């Protein structure tokens, strides 16, 4: 008789975020990240006719700030509960889409934005190729994530679906250029304070599709 495996299954990243969705906006991390949107928008030209994809949109940290400036925002995330919180905010021109980026994106975009989602995707090269394919010619990216760190930012990395402990700009730039993106530039956009007493810098990576 085969012994039963009593090891509890590791929760999926989506289930982690589903469980956290209700009070996500009130968490210290989210309140610090609220400073990102205006700094990102200062470096991302947008027009009232633009279609924008917010990758890893969560409860709408970026989407809700971008929506008044453009025609439509598609908020993509794997957590249905996070997107439900976003929907409840009542922005008529934000469409939510729960699914995997590699299952196909629901449109073409003039800009793709993201905040603290890249490190949740194992294959960064494939992700950047998907972004490039989904952009109109001349379309722009504005992506925020951690500079390289030692894994202490999240702590419980497996439970939270963390595949990368931040990124080295030169490595990320090379992958973006291989995906067909140009004009890649990095600026430090925020320093986050964590309960372990440390600060972690975040970058804003910008670029465009020729």
Across the structure, where does each feature detected by a protein language model lie?
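A short glycine-rich, Lys/Arg-flanked "PGG" loop and its adjoining helix->strand segment in the class I
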Residues: 126-137
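Short catalytic micro-motifs in class I SAM-dependent methyltransferases
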Residues: 116-117
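C-terminal lobe and adjacent flexible extensions of AdoMet/dcAdoMet transferase-like proteins
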Residues: 205-210
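Conserved class I S-adenosyl-L-methionine
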Residues: 2-46, 61-62, 85, 190
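C-terminal alpha-helical "lid/dimerization" subdomain adjacent to the S-adenosyl-L-methionine
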Residues: 8-12, 27-31, 62, 142-199
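Class I SAM-dependent methyltransferase SAM/SAH-binding core
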Residues: 53-103
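A conserved beta-strand element that flanks and buttresses the S-adenosyl-L-methionine
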Residues: 113
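Short glycine-centered segments of the SAM/dcSAM-binding site in methyltransferase folds
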Residues: 51, 139-140
């Amino acid at each position: 008789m085969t012994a039963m495996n009593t090891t509890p299954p590791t929760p999926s990243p989506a289930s982690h975020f589903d469980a956290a969705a209700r009070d996500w906006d009130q968490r210290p991390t989210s309140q610090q990240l609220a400073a990102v949107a205006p700094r990102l928008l200062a470096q991302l030209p947008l027009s009232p006719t633009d279609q924008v994809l917010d990758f890893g949109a969560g409860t709408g940290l970026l989407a809700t700030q971008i929506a008044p400036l453009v025609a439509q925002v598609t908020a993509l995330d794997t957590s249905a509960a996070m997107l439900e919180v976003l929907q409840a905010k009542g922005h008529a021109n934000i469409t939510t889409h729960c699914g995997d980026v590699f299952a196909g994106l629901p449109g073409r975009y003039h800009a793709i934005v993201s905040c603290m989602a890249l490190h949740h995707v194992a294959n960064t090269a494939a992700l950047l190729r998907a972004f490039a394919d989904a952009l109109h010619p001349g379309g722009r990216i504005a992506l925020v994530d951690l500079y390289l760190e030692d894994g202490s930012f999240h702590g419980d990395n497996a439970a939270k679906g963390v595949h990368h402990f931040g990124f080295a700009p030169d490595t990320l730039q090379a992958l973006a250029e291989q995906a067909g993106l140009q004009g890649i530039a990095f600026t430090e956009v925020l320093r986050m304070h964590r309960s372990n007493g440390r600060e972690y810098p975040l970058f804003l990576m910008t670029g465009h599709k020729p």
